[in-house]
Structures are given as C-alpha cells and as structure tokens.
C-alpha cells in the first residue's frame, strides 16, 4: 500500500496571501537588508525528507538546496547540480554536483562537503521513514516500489546511485518529461549520513539545530506561535544572489487584521496584506491610493470537499444518529453535491476577504489551474470546458477561466436539489441536512467566508432543506480535526476547505491527490489511501482511479493532457470537490523590488524562497507594479522559450 500525506495548505496561508508570493516591484533603492513579515502555521517538524506539509517545506526551501531551483521567470536552473544530462530513452538522469557546496550547522560551522551520496542517503531515509511524499517518487524511481513494499531489503537495487562524489544518477521506471521539476520537492533533497546517524530520532525536530544547512539561510529561531528567524549563510555557495541579511517572521493568528498595515506604516513590516472589509480600509485606501497592488494568481488551488465517511463527531451540531446518517447519505448523492455547488456564491465568498472590488480576483474554477498546461494551442481549462457537454445541459457553455464565477446558479441548484431530495427521501433521509464546517475562532476572514457560504446555500436551497453549521474552534482544535489529523477517521467535519500546490509540471500532480490507492488529499475526504471503502466506490472514485492509471501510461504530451482534461471534467461533474479560490490575487502594500524574487509553478524553490528577493525603502506604486509586470511577462515568454529550446542540449 502506498500512503501519503499531502503538501496541502490551510486557509490561513490563503488569508495571508503575501510574503514573497507577489514577487512585487518598486524602484532600485535597496537600502534595507531585513525582510519582516508574518507567518500563520507552525511546522510540526523540520524533517524535510519525511514531512510534506507546506508549513515545513516553505521553511526548508530557504535552508536546504536540492539539485535544481527556479529563476525569476520560472525556468528550472542549476543549484547544487552544475549540469545534468538525460539519456536518449528518457530513463536515466545524471547530475554533476558543484564542488563548492558545503553543509553547515545552525551556528554556521562547516560540517562537510555536499556529495552525491547525500542524495542516495536522503532517498533511502525517506523510504525507510515512509515519507509523506513517497507518492511523488515511488512509481518513478526504478526499484523504489519494491524496496518500499518489502519485496527487497537491498537499497542498492534502487535507481539512485552515487557514481562518484560529484555525480548522482537516477534511473526511472518510465520516461517523465517533468522529472526535473520533481527534484524541487524536498523528498529528493540531500542529507549527510553522519549527521543523520548522530541525531537519530531527533533529526528534523522543530529546532534549528536538528538539521544541517546547505542553502541561502541559517535558521536562528523557531518559537511556536511566536517567531521564525533566518540569517544569511555567509558561506553559501551562491551568496552573491542572497540580498537579504535577515528574515524575521512574527506569528499572526488573523484576529487583528489592521495590525499588518499598522506595522507596515510604522516600518516594522516589509509588506502588508490588506483586508478591504476591515473597518480601517477606507482610510488606508485613501492614504495609500497609489500603492495598493493586486498580486497575480498563482498555481496553488483551493477547494471545498465533502467528508464521505465521517467517523468523528467531537465538533458538531447534530443531536441524533438519524441526523448523522442523513448527512452521510446526502453527501454520497451526486445531485445533492451538485446542488451545493450551484448554490455556492463564490463572488460573495471572495468579497469577504477582498471586498467587492477584488471579489473575483482570487476565484479559481478548476483544481488544475486553467493555464497550467496547453493542448494544441488551447489552455487546459478551455479543453476541460469542451468535455463538459458530455455530462449534461447544465454544463453547456461553461467557462473555467480564473477570475469569474461560472457555477453560481440558483435555478440549477434548486433543480438538482429537487432531484436529490426525491432520491434521498426514498432512502428515509430526514431534512434539513446539517453540514458541519469548522473554522478558527480567531480567523475573522475565515468566519466571514463560511458565514457567506451559509447565507448563499441556505437562501437558495432553504434552511428547511440544508443548514451549514459553523463550528468555531481554537487553533489546536481546528488543526487536530483537519490539517494535522493523522487518519481519515480523525477528520471531524462534513465540509473541508484546503489547498494544493503542485509538486511537478504535469496535470497529474493535482488530479492524483484523489487517487484511491495513494492520493495525498484523500484522507480529507474521509478515506484512507489503499484501503477498500464502499463510500469511495459509491461516488465513483474507483472509476476515477482507473482513468488516472490510463492517463499515466500516455507519454505523448498532447494526448496525455487530453486524458487529464477528461479526468478534470469528471471531477467537476462529480462535485466531490468544489473549486473556490487560488493563492494570489490579493491586495497588499510592499517594499520589495520589481519581480526580482524566484518564481515557480511547482516545487519549493519559487514563491517560497527568499533567495533573489530584494528589499527597498520606497513603497511600491501601483503604476510601477503594472509597468514592471508587463515587462516581466514579455521577458518571461522569451526566457521560457529559450530555456525550452536549450533542453535538447542535455539529451546525451
């Protein structure tokens, strides 16, 4: 059985929506060397080889380097690997390591050189520890599945080899055009064997001294619900591209939205996420009328999903077993789920965090971003839309582009609910159906968002038919019932809102997360990966998994993406997940230089990284940002084209 935890994200990350995510702009006056802002989720550990949650990987991206990284245009460029080659058959990738890369302790003391064996050690450790990210590599690296499943105990049979101190080689099961993008995931990062042995079970615990550093920064402080601090690694192999000396992040629980702007105005923060619905926003808007920037939407998608097999009821408004049973029957009914989908007013939901002006700027309507890949000159989203005609007239003419709501339709919602109610009453279901949705009690935007959903669904379908019960929890209760719950049975809700950032450049990175055998998001649906469940079969996830397996066999990019468009269309029609918003698309103020930071659609070396980021004294203007964005987009197109052409040089 292959089981994984997802590199999924909580709503808290969405609410902040800034940090270096904008890669925003300004003039060239770069006096400051410190980046100050906030963070919203403590990491459970720093074990980048075993963990796969964003709370960990976003930190480690700044502390540990892998083979490759992203530049400011999203190209994959050398990092610890100076160069690489791939065999003609696409099965063997060989990386030549730089000789000046070193490991350092958290105090900055040199520990050892980085060698090819460190990458072998890293993957073996990840396999032995049953890493949450094994789904990324288990079926990719030759022999790894046999080692993980116990068919062999000899790791030397696995397709990762240290040919010498400076050469590491991976042999794949089948060609993967996107393999290099996988090397940006922390499961393929190196680790020093001697240090690993010396730490034992303490390796990677939530303490700066628990790991070694070969990246741009050293962690100087990690205090739960208080602060995270980094200092530039002066001996880093690429120190010339690290322009910030100190990074200081202060814990933010969402209870005092105005504090972000206050600290920015006082000079304590480098950036500030703005909340258009806050009581002080009109004053802020007048004060900073020439400085408010809306960031671009990025590749992280958020969506609601139903718990198909709920076992825990610690946080519920249900008072009887018949209410619990009725809800379980309802969420298994496709017409009911579609009714909820069409009754969900996403524009109103977006307005709770972005105000009326920016309400649609964050909306995303597919799990796979509509422009993530193209198929014969058409965006992925366009092709998915063309597939929807196969699923009924309710989907005709739908547009899945970002930044608008194609779903909200009270007439469709009522029609679907009428069908659902007839089917459910025949099974003895009692109405209204109660759906529990948890939210942190300190998360003002989250509470406003859930309240908006409650209002739109109950007003369209009637509170005598459906009731959204808002469960306001403490931070620890919220985490333990959702994001940090260890099993599907511990997931304590009927509706969940989470996000997924892509691990590699292929639609499967999003759609595989619901695979019944290994899906990284499956537990959030109340299902355990690899375990038979009649609820999964009842909603068609067995068919969905078969479609994934067939698509994964296809190596021709156009044909492959076409198959994944079919799968995305199936998922939309099923309404098992309800796409909502993306990261980005949010208003902020900042003092960072124009599009200097790394940019990436996948992995951990893009928006998460402070390498390349430049801080300045002057506040960025809206006009400066617009001009810089236009310039960057043009340069990006040219740079990406050149990088694509140069790939052929690596085939040997």
From Swiss-Prot:
GO biological process per UniProt: peptide transport; protein transport
Chief subcellular location: membrane
Segment forming the signal sequence: 1-24
GO cellular component: ATP-binding cassette (ABC) transporter complex; periplasmic space
Pfam families referenced in this protein's UniProt entry, alphabetically: SBP_bac_5
InterPro entries referenced in this protein's UniProt entry, alphabetically: Peptide/Ni-bd, SBP_5, SBP_5_CS, SBP_5_dom
Cell membrane among keywords: yes
GO molecular function, one term: peptide transmembrane transporter activity
Keyword set, alphabetical order: Cell membrane, Lipoprotein, Membrane, Palmitate, Peptide transport, Protein transport, Signal, Transport
Membrane topology per record: Lipid-anchor
CDD domains: PBP2_OppA (cd08504)
Lipidation (N-palmitoyl cysteine): 25
Lipidation (S-diacylglycerol cysteine): 25
Cysteines engaged in disulfide bonds, as pairs: none
PANTHER family found in the cross-reference section: PERIPLASMIC BINDING COMPONENT OF ABC TRANSPORTER, PERIPLASMIC OLIGOPEPTIDE-BINDING PROTEIN-RELATED
Record family assignment: Belongs to the bacterial solute-binding protein 5 family.
Role summary: Part of the binding-protein-dependent transport system for oligopeptides; probably an oligopeptide binding protein.
Name of the featured protein: Oligopeptide-binding protein AliB
Annotated organism of origin: Streptococcus pneumoniae (strain ATCC BAA-255 / R6)
Lineage: Bacteria, Bacillati, Bacillota, Bacilli, Lactobacillales
